Amino acid sequence: ALYEKHGIDLSGLERSKGNTFHWEGEYEVNMNNRRTLETDLGVIEHWMPSVPSSLAESQYVLLANCAPQLQHHVLKQLNSPQFVVADTMDLWLNIARQELEALLKEVDCLVLNDSEARQLMEEDNLVVATQEMHRFGPRYIIVKKGEHGAILSGPKGLFVAPAFPLKTVIDPTGAGDSFVGGMLGYLAEKGGDIESHLRQAIIHGSVTASFCCEGFGVTTTTQTTRQDIDQLSLIHISE
């Protein structure tokens, strides 16, 4: 009912018996820093997603954070999408790096956080790490930096986007998903040339993520309106 209320297409939804994906972590006083304590893949450990024919023509695709081999499996079922974004996390860097590198050869954009970028490239300098990631294949690299915003590296060089400042942070879990979802949703709405809209899309994603952090779970994001997001996305990027 919650998804339908927000107009989300559920035609590709699959249900399986078993435990849901479970992640347990610990945030420091500085919530930019978190430590993974436990990850239980649950039903997705042996899941092979099937893309309905009605969605196979999708032009804007987010390969959400899961095992790289599953992301690749989804990608192979799509018919020439215009823009493919892959999200990942430290777990896959540790246990499926080879599969991740194979996937990156076939996507347009990689999104990950700053600690994962440093881990992937074995490089402490974040600017250097961001730019060197292009050698894996993606034309665009986006590195999330929590309260410090995000870095985009692409054909036009670097772009640094601020995060929306918050007085109160309740739970940052899910902020990364909110960021990339808001960003890609903006791009899909605008259509046309990716380069013309990507920087503004990142601002849009940053604002979307800020609402996620202000509540636990989806309590805040489900009450957020498009008007709320647009009012805070007032930074207009000159391309």
Residue locations for each model-derived region?
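Acidic, amphipathic alpha-helical patches
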Residues: 51, 100, 169
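Short, acidic/turn-prone active-site loops that include or flank metal/cofactor-
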Residues: 15-17, 88-92, 116, 164-167
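Short, well-ordered alpha-helical microsegments
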Residues: 22, 69-72, 96
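Conserved phosphate-binding/catalytic region of the ribokinase-like
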Residues: 126-234, 238
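Conserved N-terminal subdomain of the carbohydrate kinase-like
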Residues: 1-62, 76-80, 230-234, 238
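Short beta->alpha connector loops
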Residues: 65-70, 89-93
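Short gly/ser/thr-rich secondary-structure transition/capping motifs
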Residues: 41-46, 88-94
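Conserved phosphate/ATP/ADP-binding segment of small-molecule kinases
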Residues: 80-83, 90-160
